[in-house]
UniProtKB/Swiss-Prot annotation:
Gene name as annotated: MRGPRG-AS1
Biased composition (Low complexity): 72-90
Annotated region (Disordered), positions in chain: 1-20, 66-94, 111-158
Protein name (record): Putative uncharacterized protein MRGPRG-AS1
Parts forming coiled coils: none
Residue ranges with Polar residues bias: 1-18, 111-120, 149-158
Length: 158
């Protein structure tokens, strides 16, 4: 009797979790009201089903890996595999609200690192070519003092 009630309460809580709507939660109090034993098993079944629904352990390594990739600067290679990884990690048995939160977090990490680092690297490359290209030609013809001043100014800029 206990196993059967535990299985039915477990299937109802899992259907509630997979659908993300409260309609599947209404039959659960009817099962709990049958007796004290079913109330205890329903509480145990819900306790066992809550960690897979929230998914705290798989999400944290994914976010940490995204941060490590964004720090290294390889945003072009990390942008394409990060979206399938985040969807596959958040698909099993998540409510709609949790799914939206984890999806927006992964997009924000990838989007911010991609937009901040790749144009920044291009701007640094343009600065080097723009400053060094014209500035070397006149300074070789001019004085050595101007050359040393340009070196100190470039050191402060970077």
């Amino acid at each position: 009797m206990d196993l059967a009630s535990e299985i039915t309460s477990a299937t109802q809580t899992s259907s509630l979790c997979s659908s993300g709507r409260g309609h599947a939660g209404y039959p659960a109090p009817g099962i709990v009201a049958h007796g004290f034993e079913t109330h205890g098993t329903a509480r145990v079944a819900q306790g066992h089903l809550l960690p897979p629904c929230l998914l705290p352990p798989p999400q944290m390594p994914v976010l940490a890996a995204l941060r490590d990739l964004s720090r290294r600067g390889s945003t072009s290679s990390s942008r394409s595999p990060s979206r399938p990884v985040s969807t596959s990690a958040s698909k099993p048995c998540l409510p709609a609200s949790c799914l939206g939160e984890t999806w927006s977090i992964s997009i924000n990490l990838v989007g911010s690192s991609g937009h901040l680092q790749s144009p920044g690297a291009q701007r640094d490359a343009q600065r080097e070519t723009g400053c060094l290209g014209p500035s070397w030609l006149p300074h070789h013809q001019g004085r050595d003092e101007e050359l040393s001043l340009s070196h100190s100014a470039q050191g402060e800029e970077f």
